Swiss-Prot record:
It comes from Escherichia coli (strain SMS-3-5 / SECEC). This is Multidrug resistance protein MdtL. Keywords: Antibiotic resistance, Cell inner membrane, Cell membrane, Membrane, Transmembrane, Transmembrane helix, Transport. One of its GO terms (molecular function) is transmembrane transporter activity. It is a multi-pass membrane protein. The gene is mdtL. Pfam families: MFS_1 (PF07690). The keyword Transmembrane helix applies. The keyword Transport applies. Belongs to the major facilitator superfamily. DHA1 family. MdtL (TC 2.A.1.2.22) subfamily.
């Protein structure tokens, strides 16, 4: 079992590493490529576009051909794209490399969640996804620090060589450690069960909405945090970095505590707690009389996301034993596109950073609480799920 957990964690971590590690080198990259920092900030959106594009096909291929045939090319593409970015001499080539990086990371991301669905029952999967969420929260803190240390001695290209090295590690794990987990092709008698795993299942769609809104909350916070903390609240850059590190610490602490909470409370209770924390955060930020109270509201956002997201993802994947790859892809596409669409629309309409965050917090909590209350699982979830591996 440990091999599957190690491989899944490694496959997922390419995604946040590809986002956060290069940011510290952005000024030098812009100078070397004769582009403005503003022009290169689109590299974030290009990377996410690559991930979304990969998810359109990766899940279906993973369900038909297996997890390894998607993970291995995905890791290889991430390596090649990282090297391509390091060799880019124009901003156009650099952005093309970032899109390819996103494609590779997207393939690996989809496979990671499919593997966890293949190998873990619902309760254990919820615990592991909560731990994974905590580890993912470490990357936005550690990656820029590692990038800064690298750039003290080496040029910005070394950041992408470091990412390539990470990709090589994932490729080696996928080649030599990961074993195929895709369930065996169903017999004719099992076809009705395969056909019953519909993406239009009300319970699955409700969890897609809940997780998409939750990701929209956390990405809205990350996207607006420089404006909120430095421009509106007046913190210095160093203080901003400290606050963001503390919020990551809150996320990690809650994420690592959630598996223990699942041993005491029902998953539904934790999901309700998550949305109540979002609602409390929105109200706190809306009526906040001081910076201290606002910072408390921000910690509620991080705690709310960490306590409920892994549980919701586990529930979303639960009904899909034969189509876990497609389900994972659908979740990823909805989360990436839905959150990006909200942030873009809010900016186009002219909603301020503060109101943008308060609005998504309150909308997410109300909609999600209604879905949790009124949309129950369509079938009982087995306490244990036997894995039928390919020979």
């Amino acid at each position: 079992m440990s091999r599957f957990l190690i491989c899944s964690f490694a496959l997922v971590l390419l995604y946040p590493a590809g986002i956060d590690m290069y940011l510290v080198g952005l000024p030098r990259i812009a100078a070397d490529l004769n582009a403005s920092e503003a022009q290169l900030h689109i590299a974030f959106s290009v990377y996410l576009a690559g991930m979304a594009a990969a998810m359109l096909f990766a899940g279906k291929v993973a369900d038909r051909s297996g997890r390894k045939p998607v993970a291995i090319p995905g890791a290889a593409l991430f390596i090649i794209a990282s090297v391509f970015c390091s060799l880019a001499e124009t901003s156009t080539l650099f952005l093309a490399g970032r899109f390819l990086q996103g494609l590779g990371a997207g393939c690996c991301y989809v496979v990671a969640f499919a593997i966890l669905r293949d190998t873990l029952d619902d309760r254990r999967r919820a615990k592991v996804l909560s731990l994974l969420n905590g580890i993912t929260c470490i990357i936005p803190v550690l990656a820029p620090v590692l990038g800064h240390l690298i750039m003290l001695k080496f040029p910005w290209q070394s950041l992408f060589w470091t990412m390539a090295t990470m990709g090589i590690a994932v490729l080696m794990l996928s080649l030599f450690i990961l074993k195929e987990t895709r369930p065996a092709a169903p017999a004719a008698s099992d076809k009705p069960r395969e056909n019953s795993e519909s993406l239009l299942n009300r319970f699955f769609l409700s969890r897609v909405v809940i997780t998409t809104l939750s990701v929209s909350v956390i990405l809205t916070f990350v996207n607006t945090s420089p404006v909120l903390l430095m421009e509106i609240m007046g913190f210095e850059r160093g203080e901003y970095a400290t606050i963001m590190a503390l919020t990551a610490g809150v996320s990690m602490t809650v994420s690592f505590s959630t598996p223990f909470a699942l041993g005491i409370f029902k998953p539904r209770t934790l999901m309700i707690t998550s949305q109540v924390l979002f609602l409390a955060a929105g109200i706190t930020l809306a009526v906040s009389p001081s910076h201290a109270v606002s910072l408390f509201g921000i910690t509620l956002i991080c705690a709310g996301f960490s306590v409920g997201f892994g549980v919701a993802m586990s529930q979303a994947l639960g009904p899909f034993s034969l189509r876990a790859g497609v389900a994972s892809s659908t979740l990823g596409i909805a989360q990436v596109c839905g959150s990006s669409l909200w942030i873009w629309l809010a900016a186009v309409v002219g909603i301020g950073a503060w109101n943008m965050l308060i609005g998504i917090l309150i909308a997410c909590s109300i909609v999600s609480l209604l879905l949790i209350m009124f949309v129950a699982p369509g079938r009982p979830v087995a306490a244990h799920e036997e894995i039928h591996h390919h020979a």
